[in-house]
Amino acid sequence: MSELLSIALFLASVLIYAWKAGRNTWWFAAILAVLGLFVVLNITLYASDYFTGDGINDAVLYTLTNSLTGAGVSKYILPGAGIVLALAAVFSALGWVLRRRRHHPHHFGYSLLALLLALGSVDASPAFRQISELVKSQSRDGDPDFPAYYKEPSKTIPNPQLNLVYIYGESLERTYFDNDAFPDLTPELGALKNEGLDFSHTMQLPGTDYTIAGMVASQCGIPLFAPFEGNASASVSSFFPQNICLGDILKNSGYQNYFVQGANLRFAGKDVFLKSHGFDHLYGAEELKTVVADPSYRNDWGFYDDTVLDEAWKKFEELSRSGQRFSLFTLTVDTHHPDGFISRTCNRKRYDFDGKPNQSFSAVSCSQENIAEFINKIKASPWFKNTVIVVSSDHLAMNNTAWKYLNKQDRNNLFFVLRGDQPQQDTLAVKRNTMDNGATVLDILGGDNFIGLGRSSLSGQSLSEVFLNSKEKILAMKPDIIRLWNFPKEMKDFTVDRDKDMIAFSGSHFRLPLLLRVSDKRVEPLPESEYSAPLRFQLANFAPRDNFVWVDRCYKMAQLWAPELALSTDWCVSQGQLGGQQSIQHVDKAQWKGKTAFKDTVIDMERYKGNVDTLKIVDNDIRYKADSFIFNVAGAPEEVKQFSGISRPESWGRWSNAQLGDEVKIEYNTPLPKKFDLVITAKAFGANANRPIPVRVGKEEQTLVLENEVTTTTLHFDNPSNASTLVIVPPDPVSTNEGNILGHSPRKLGIGMVEIKVVNAEG
């Protein structure tokens, strides 16, 4: 209703000003600004819906000041460009309409009415309401009801009898199981759901709407609100350290806790969370690659669901035979947005909807088949009678190719339970949320019926039942939940552990690199993650007087304040204010002690602008002083004009990447010498080893042969044509996820370059 009202007010404002108000420069500017704000808000809402499927939420608020990099981001470039073009077109059209009758005399009353209508359209828009609520949630002191509803469970289960298998289905919400809406989409897993306790109204609350947040909510009974962006949790050393979560209780009760997934465990800090709360046995992409049958059978995120669930079954068999009490948690990935992935063992690899194939529905149909097969193996085993199986979605699906069809339905998360000890079949329509999952499981296992804000749906009352406005209530509790981190409010002394890549201050530990905004009674950590911008881009968003401490590789900050460190990959510490004084120090000891020293100086806006502009220089445009091209740092020597076909820097160097160009091209500012030696330190990837690799300068061509290990080769060139471009052509680029950023499309690797040096041989 508010959406229609806001649009009506917007159109009324445009029409009244365009046809009745006449022209006045100041009124025109004011009305265009307010109407433009309406447009920006609604396009932001549309874009947020596209990425999150949940409007403008906490993740969007974070992203407004940080670039979105990471999982599958290339698939969003075209929609993002379309949004920018649409915004420009709408602004141009709006300005043209408002100036249509510019020669008519100005009318104060109609101008005022148009402005009031424009302001009303902004106030009535859902986007403005969502942003306002989020901003309020950042500034509240907390909710007086929090102490009454937050309850710590007992640390043990009195007499545990049952093993636990808990399956998180990535984005596998209950909506997919509506056979009327999506016929025969989930026949195998749907049949199993109907055999157990099916909780049909599991809503999604703020702070539970992405994977690590859904896991925290389901095990600790609280949403993931933190003093930093949730997916950046990989940088912390402990996760809600004061909370008692399901894993803690299981471990204290004699359970061995296992977790198996196909993606990298470090992503979003899953390893930190699980290790902090009772899990001693973790298996992710790195751990599984030495044990799976086919290590090359992977998707963009890691191993396919059939591989992961096969390993989970092996672990279930092994643990059951041992007689040890255990819990086995697993997380699928094939249904990850925006498209999903199809395991090769599925019987149904395609699902048509609206008369055409739909990749997301196809991935759901395939993944549920894999999950059902895993469950049926357990049910057919002699150990099922001592086992509880839980299947839940980690969160509602984000914007995938099925999302518009899901939104036409009443959407709920999946949560059902299969008990081997006492089979029960029922559909329970009680109102609940993800935070109730862990408490319900704990209740079934014989423990308390509450964890944090979660309550057992079998014997307790969910906050979703108690409060009609449960979403607003949870946002009001956000400051209370953030305080559970026990995060320090000041930073004076700190220690950088060079060997462990950690920084410690005021009792807290963080993985490096790290950027901190330090103010009175608040320290705000800004870690670097797959979803956040590089730290220098985050620092560029700081105000001129914001105090910062930045710990990163020296070369990343050297171009600003210490050019002599431009080739150093050691750790450095920089601190100060972008508009004031800055310092940079080289971490030259294993345990390096530092102190914050912020000076209250006069702000220089020219210095501030220069620092911000330098921080925003993209990697490939950075230049440093050196007599060779060093590939394990960003940028290139000053002599290089441009380069292409080369991937990002890694600790050892850089790979060629045929996704960025079939050839490695390095163009210098001036012609290369008439005679020179080209000294190449490099290695080959896969099938490119021990094969001739053409290296060209102008019309001259030499052949390079590399091994899988790094070697140094010198090639002798004549350059009579004064060519300025060096070209290297990997013979057989291989599509692989080797060393890839989680969620990115595979790279096509050919050669790995450590250093290239041009040595003048004239005279």
Swiss-Prot record:
- A single cellular component GO annotation: plasma membrane
Where does the record place a coiled coil?
none
Q: What does the record give as the reaction this protein catalyses? A: a phosphatidylglycerol + a membrane-derived-oligosaccharide D-glucose = a 1,2-diacyl-sn-glycerol + a membrane-derived-oligosaccharide 6-(glycerophospho)-D-glucose
Give the membrane topology. Answer: Multi-pass membrane protein
Q: Return the broad EC class.
A: transferase
Subcellular localization(s) per the UniProt record:
Cell inner membrane
Q: From the UniProt record, give the pathway where this protein acts.
A: Glycan metabolism; osmoregulated periplasmic glucan (OPG) biosynthesis
Output the GO biological process annotations, alphabetical, semicolon-separated.
glucan biosynthetic process
Q: Which NCBIfam families match?
A: PRK03776.1 (NF003000)
Name of this chain's protein: Phosphoglycerol transferase I
Q: Which gene encodes it?
A: mdoB
